[in-house]
Amino acid sequence: MPRDERHTATIPYGTLGIVPLKSCSKMGEKVDDYLVQWREQREHENQSNLAFSGYKRDSYVVSASTPRFGSGEGKGVLNDSIRGYDLYIMVDVCNYSIEYSLCGTTNHMSPDDHYADLKRVIAAAGGKARRINVIRPFLYESRQHKRSGRESLDCALMLQELTAMGVENIITFDAHDPRVHNSIPLKGFESVSCTYQFIKYLLLGVDDLHIDSEHMMVISPDEGGMGAPNRYFHFCFRLISSLSQIIL
C-alpha cells in the first residue's frame, strides 16, 4: 500500500489543534501552512465520515495566550474550545528573545519561564482535550539526566510532571540522552535525529568544506553527546560513497 494511502486509511484520533506558544509562533505558522496545504490537496473517500469532521480547515491553530499580572505571576488562556481535540502544543524553551515587564524592568524569559507557561496552557485545557502532545525542539533540562552527586533529576521530574498532567506524547529533537524515556516508559517519547539537516546545510553553506581525514575532525563537547559525531561521520561517509558511485 502506498504511503499516502496508508495514512488515509487511518481515522484521526481527534480534531487536530496546534497551540504554538509565543516562543514558537513563527514555527507554528509554518507548520500550520504546511498542514493546510497538504490536507487540501489530499483526496480520500472518507470525507463525509463523521470522524473526519473538521479535517480540512483554513487553519489548525488554537489561539492561546500567557499574560502576566503586575506581580509577575502568569496564567494560561485558551481562547478557542478544544473539547475532543488532538492538541499539539509547541514550545521553545531556549527562546530568550521573549520579554516581559516586572516592576518596571524588562526581563528575558528563561527556560523555567517557558516551561511554566507550557504547564499553564495544559492546565487551561482542563482535561477537555482528547489527547495532549508536546513538541519541543530542545528537551527542557535534558542535560540534567543523571546524578553525579547530591543532585536533582530535573529531566525525569519534568517528564513525569507533564505525563501526570495528561500529556500522552513528547516529541523533541536530538535529545541529550534519549534513555531518559525510562522515567516514563508507558508514555510516548520521540527524539527525532537531525543528522541529515545538519549535514545538508553544512554542505550548502560552507563552500570550502572538505570531508576527508586530512581536513575534517568532528568533536563532541561532552561525553553525553558522543553519539552525534559518530552519526555525522557515518552519514558523511555514506554520502561521499553515494556521490562517488554517481560520478563514476
Protein language model annotation of sequence segments:
Residues 1-248:
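PRPP-associated nucleotide enzymes
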